[in-house]
Amino acid sequence: MSQIKLIVGLANPGAKYEGTRHNAGEWLVNELARMYNTSLKDEAKYFGKTAKINTVNGDVWLLIPTTFMNLSGKAVGALAHFFRIKAEEILIAHDELDLPPGVAKLKQGGGHGGHNGLKDIISALGNNNNFYRIRLGIGHPGHKDQVAGYVLSKPAPQDQQKINAVIDEASRCLEILFKDGVTSATNRLNSFKA
C-alpha cells in the first residue's frame, strides 16, 4: 500500500453546524491533532484548516475543509495537487448513514454513496476514487426524506457517546496504520463496536 500523506476530516463550517452528525470526520481529525499536540490553522490557499503531524512513517498533513461539504474537493484538490499527493495516499474521514453510531469501517475505494463531500472529492481528483476512507457511523433516520435534517442535527447523548468512543478507537487505529500498515488497522477498526 502507499503511505498515507493526507488525512481529511469532512465537515460544514461555522457555529450553526458545530456538533452536527455531518461533521463527524472533523471530530476525528481534531482528535488526531490533539494526540500529536498540534492544532489546525486556517490556510486560505488550501480552502481549509491544516496541520502537519510527524508520524513513525514521516509527515502527514491534516486538513479540515472550510468550504461547505459539497465543495470539499476544492480543498482536498488544492492541497493534494500542491504537494503531489496521489489519491491512494489520501484518507478521508466522513459520516456514514449506513453504519450505526459506535461503528466505523476503514476501506479503500468505492463510490460516494450519495455523500456530497465524497462526490466532490472524487471529481476534484480527476474521477479517481482510489483514496482510503474511514466511514464513521451516525445511523440512519429511517426514511430518505429525513436524511438532510438528520445529518445537520446533533446526535442524541447516547449516540454521541458511541460516536466519541469510535473516534477514540479510530485515532488509535490510525497510529497502527502509520506503524503496521493498513491491514492491521483495518482488522482492528472494522471489528470494533462501542
UniProtKB/Swiss-Prot annotation:
Gene Ontology MF terms: peptidyl-tRNA hydrolase activity; tRNA binding
Superkingdom per UniProt: Bacteria
Keyword Cytoplasm tagged: yes
Residues the UniProt record annotates as site (Discriminates between blocked and unblocked aminoacyl-tRNA): N12
UniProt keyword RNA-binding present: yes
Function: Hydrolyzes ribosome-free peptidyl-tRNAs (with 1 or more amino acids incorporated), which drop off the ribosome during protein synthesis, or as a result of ribosome stalling. Catalyzes the release of premature peptidyl moieties from peptidyl-tRNA molecules trapped in stalled 50S ribosomal subunits, and thus maintains levels of free tRNAs and 50S ribosomes.
Catalytic activity of the protein: an N-acyl-L-alpha-aminoacyl-tRNA + H2O = an N-acyl-L-amino acid + a tRNA + H(+)
Keywords, alphabetical: Cytoplasm, Hydrolase, RNA-binding, tRNA-binding
Active-site residues annotated for this sequence: H22 (proton acceptor)
Residues noted as binding tRNA in the record, renumbered to the chain: Y17, F68, N70, N116
Database matches in Pfam families: Pept_tRNA_hydro
PANTHER family for this protein: PEPTIDYL-TRNA HYDROLASE
Quaternary state and interactors: Monomer.
The organism of origin for this protein: Haemophilus ducreyi (strain 35000HP / ATCC 700724)
InterPro entries in UniProt: Pept_tRNA_hydro (IPR001328), Pept_tRNA_hydro_CS (IPR018171), Pept_tRNA_hydro_sf (IPR036416)
SUPFAM superfamilies from the UniProt entry: Peptidyl-tRNA hydrolase-like
GO cellular component, one term: cytoplasm
Family per record: Belongs to the PTH family.
Name recorded for this polypeptide: Peptidyl-tRNA hydrolase
Subcellular location: Cytoplasm
